[in-house]
Amino acid sequence: MANSAHFFHFAPNFAGRKLPEHECIVGYAAIIQKLGLPIPIPRRIALITPGSKKKFTDEFLLFPKAYAPDDNPALDEINALYNHLVFALKYEGVNLLFFSKLSSHYNLEQLAELVAIEPSGQYSRRIWFLIEWLTGKSLPGIKDVNKKSYVLAVDPKLQFTCSGMRSPRHMVINNLPGTIDFCPLVHRTDRLEHFIKENFSTKRENYLKGFRKELLLRASSFLLLKDSKASFSIEGESPKSKRAARWGQTIGQAGMRELTTNELCRLQQLVIENERFMKWGLRTSGGFVGEHDRFSGEPLPDHISAKPDDLERLMNGLIETSHLLTEDPIDAVVAATKIAFGFVYIHPFVDGNGRIHRYIIHHLLAVKHFSQQGFIFPVSASILDHMSAYQKVLAGNSKPLLDFIEWKETPDHNIEVLNDTIDFYRYMDLTPHAEFLFECVKDTWNRIIPEELTYLNAYDTFKQYIDSQFDMPDALIALLVQFLEKGNGQLSKRAKLKEFKELHEDEIRDIEAEFAKNFMNKSTTWFIKE
């Protein structure tokens, strides 16, 4: 397999990654490299290897030589391109950002020539459909297909899809899980399939049936506050208790109100509260996440937000896709990933995006009936405990795009984007984000919720003992527990001499023993049983 005049690409290093020796880049990455398309290389690069077996890693898709697309120098460019596209659709799935840029690289006549190679073939029809769906234009000279079976636009074995609608012109079922203005995709991976098979939603229902309703309500109240504080902490804020409690109440209502742009603006007002230094609503200027140079004030972006002129279209697409996913049987965590992480990348507001992004996770899980109505799912608390992974996942999309966004500094040290970037925010690969969110879901059900329920059970048992022996006021019992927690089960000398001076030494020993029995000798870690 030699270098040709077309798309095969050999290099020891490619897009900042070291490649295994003697391997040839094919598919999407090879086309992007050859044509110079202004988009990042896909997360996983397809390679033809001297080996005899397929092997998939987080970075590479390795295929034996028998899988190589025909890229013979005798072929013209369009025919070689078609062969690589067939390979890509068959093994890499649909890449909407790629097809959007490919459709603007070639003129309509060249694209029609591409489709005409096998006008009734399933891959040709899928390519044709994607081009016309993305451009909104009909390719010249291509007649409607007839007397053929319908084929799926997206292979559901490779990526998560929706039920779909028929496109009679192409004889293609459009099962893309989104709209033209917002359609992130998620690949099916072994990790995601494993998570889905664990069926957390059903196991949750069975587990919670074993607890008193009163205990669940109290746990939900504590978890609301915990999640609210965690969401602020993720943003580096330490809100007063009242503010955290108000946002916690809002989280508790997730799924009860329809998701609209106006609803998101209402949530922003609840998050920010004070309009003195900023305007509520969609941004009217550029935006970025990052720092400023301490001397010049120049922006140092880690993420560049969508252009203000694109926000209305992007948000309409996001809302419409949210409604589509709500009604479709697509997995709830995958749906939450697409809408919530899509929102935070768009970054439609000047401030409050992060907390609203995490609210959207709650909303989608609630409307998809993954989380139980009235019982909070404290996903922010788990995210806070996994901040390094969270930041890595977010940077996975943002960082590669920085090389393809042209911008200039504004007089107020903001960013003004100069090129067309809307596709970067509507056609994303959110596979790592779905895996991360599933990890947080698992952690929440395996650790955070059980710890809270175990703690409240222990507290109630300890309180019953104190009530039966000392008839102590509830507020004083709460204070006693606080002191014992701080003292690792021992009451401090100060507490003995001041707040609990009425207790005798033998009574204190009994209390400490009862505390240890309930709080210190029980594991607070619980795992969902099969």
Residue ranges of model-derived segments:
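FIC/Doc superfamily catalytic core
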Residues: M1-V350, R355-E530
